[in-house]
């Protein structure tokens, strides 16, 4: 029975994603050349086990690969593994590895590398709790790797496909490297060339790449990947108008993060197109539940009461849609009716009542944001005005995105409220939310959420799993660990006369893409 339960989790996102990825016309691929991509910022680190930011992950998934990966519709598919067997009531997972896979340094990948990677992940990753229930590993031969868990986990394979904090396979030589100090040696189609942290990064074709020849084409992050490009140059350009100008003048082939107004400037230009992805991410206000004022749930709930979603969306100008839930409506775990009571409250009078109960006396509330993503900055600025209407002393701090992102994930920087977007958890389903739920709001202890996640992971009964997820979402929103803003879309611009093979996805992928 449990293998069926495992499969049921892997199919949760099909209804969401399928309409996005219709077949694209066949085009003639050409090999060679450099594609120039202008994005909002550069990565702080290329250690996959610590990577939760899109600007890091878009690069990381070109260099590194996982045992199982997301396909085009976000289901789990074998990647570095050729086969996965689940046994012992979903407590034993046996991975048969593809033979002949090489790292970018020419070394063949074996089960020793896989085991060393799992062991390093458990020591350094932000998402190390993924492996907290491991009893032992076995590597009986170079192409077999076995994970033994202490308890049933019906969603273990589903968790391994995650694109955030990905459990990629590194050479065993990296096992003892501290966090953020790993060498960029991967099995992916590209390898790191040049990296100037305030300017640009260049990926080069990995000549040692071993494609999965059992597949006809790439499929999400799985399947047959081909590096047609000699190189990809990532230019870090924080200003959206400057990115658009780079596309219009031919200095960039692809650009990130267009607002609706900027995207309209491409209308009527036959050589330039917009790549639209929706749903893409979900935007939230994140409240630091272990720091100062926002350690008090009454303060967090007061902040929730002032939020006027329409005013925020009007200010940001991004592609968006209202939705109170942590998931998208096609999901069988969607809890929109329950979540609605915590959404778009716009009730400053209620906020004042909660502030009085909390004993608030005009202390400074720090709102931290960044200048790289205008929608984040503008959201925080609008929120600060809404907070002031309720009598909250809001102090806005604008820093760079990578500092903002690191502070969000580490809890550093003395902030109370920030904002960001989460892309993979809403698409991939309830199990993927666990690391996000705990990491970003810095929840110290919440027994109700702990127990519900335990039921979600271990139960073989679908109604029980649904009830567990509804309990998690209800508690999470009630305690205002985060406040939902909206579902958001992505608008990217590209030169259609020069770029071929580019397909919509919530990450840009430059394998199986070429320049004409």
Where are these regions (language model features)?
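Aromatic-rich, solvent-exposed beta-strand/loop patch
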Residues: 89, 104, 148-166, 185-242, ...
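Surface-exposed binding/hinge segments that line
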Residues: 29-30, 85, 96, 129-174, ...
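Aromatic- and charge-enriched surface segment that lines or borders ligand/interaction sites
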Residues: 82-127, 140, 146-148, 246, ...
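Periplasmic binding protein-like
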Residues: 37, 106, 385-435, 467-470
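Structural transition elements
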Residues: 190, 320-357, 373-376
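N-terminal lobe/hinge region of extracytoplasmic solute-binding protein
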Residues: 38-88, 119, 185
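Extracytoplasmic/peripheral linker and loop segments enriched in polar/acidic and small residues
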Residues: 344, 395-404, 431-498, 516
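Periplasmic-binding protein-like
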Residues: 47, 265, 290, 294-331, ...
């Amino acid at each position: 029975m449990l293998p069926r339960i495992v499969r049921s989790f892997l199919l949760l996102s099909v209804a969401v994603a399928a309409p996005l990825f219709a077949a694209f016309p066949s085009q003639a691929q050409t090999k060679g050349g450099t594609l120039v991509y202008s994005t909002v910022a550069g990565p702080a680190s290329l250690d996959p086990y610590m990577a939760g930011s899109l600007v890091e992950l878009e690069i990381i998934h070109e260099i590194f690969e996982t045992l199982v990966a997301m396909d085009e519709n976000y289901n789990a598919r074998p990647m570095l593994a050729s086969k996965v067997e689940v046994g012992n009531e979903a407590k034993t997972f046996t991975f048969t590895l593809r033979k002949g896979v090489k790292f970018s340094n020419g070394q063949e990948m074996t089960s020793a590398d896989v085991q060393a990677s799992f062991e390093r992940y458990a020591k350094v990753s932000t998402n190390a709790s993924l492996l907290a229930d491991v009893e032992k590993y076995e590597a009986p031969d170079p192409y077999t790797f076995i994970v033994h868990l202490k308890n049933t986990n019906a969603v273990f394979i589903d968790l391994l496909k995650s694109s955030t904090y990905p459990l990629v396979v590194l050479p065993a030589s990296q096992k003892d490297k501290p966090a953020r100090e790993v060498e960029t040696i991967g099995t992916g189609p590209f390898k790191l060339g040049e990296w100037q942290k305030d300017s640009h990064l260049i990926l080069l074709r990995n000549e040692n790449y071993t494609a999965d020849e059992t597949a006809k084409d790439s499929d999400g992050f799985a399947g047959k990947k081909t590096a047609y490009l000699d190189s990809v140059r990532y230019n870090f350009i924080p200003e959206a108008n400057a990115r658009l100008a780079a596309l219009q003048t031919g200095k960039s082939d692809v650009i990130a993060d267009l607002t609706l107004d900027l995207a309209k400037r491409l209308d009527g230009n036959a050589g330039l197109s917009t790549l639209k992805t929706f749903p893409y991410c979900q935007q939230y206000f994140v409240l630091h539940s272990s720091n100062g004022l926002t350690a008090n749930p009454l303060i967090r709930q007061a902040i929730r009461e002032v939020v006027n979603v329409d005013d925020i969306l009007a200010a940001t100008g991004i592609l968006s849609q209202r939705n109170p839930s942590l998931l998208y409506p096609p999901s069988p775990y969607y809890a929109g009716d329950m979540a609605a009571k915590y959404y778009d409250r716009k009730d400053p009078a209620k906020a004042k009542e909660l502030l009085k109960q909390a004993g608030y006396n005009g202390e400074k509330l720090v709102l931290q944001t960044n200048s790289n993503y205008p929608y984040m900055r503008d959201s925080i600025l609008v929120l600060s005005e809404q907070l002031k209407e309720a009598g909250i002393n809001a102090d806005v701090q604008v820093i760079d995105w990578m500092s903002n992102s690191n502070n969000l994930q580490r809890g550093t920087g003395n902030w109370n409220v920030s904002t960001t977007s989460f892309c993979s958890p809403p698409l991939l389903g309830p199990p993927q939310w666990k690391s996000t739920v705990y990491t970003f709001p810095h929840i110290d202890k919440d027994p109700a959420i702990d127990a519900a996640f335990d039921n979600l992971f271990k139960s073989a009964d679908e109604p029980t799993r649904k009830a567990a997820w509804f309990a998690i979402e209800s508690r999470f929103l009630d305690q205002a660990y985060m406040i939902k803003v909206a579902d958001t879309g992505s608008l990217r611009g590209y030169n259609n006369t020069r770029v071929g093979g580019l397909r919509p996805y919530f990450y840009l992928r430059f394998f199986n893409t070429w320049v004409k």
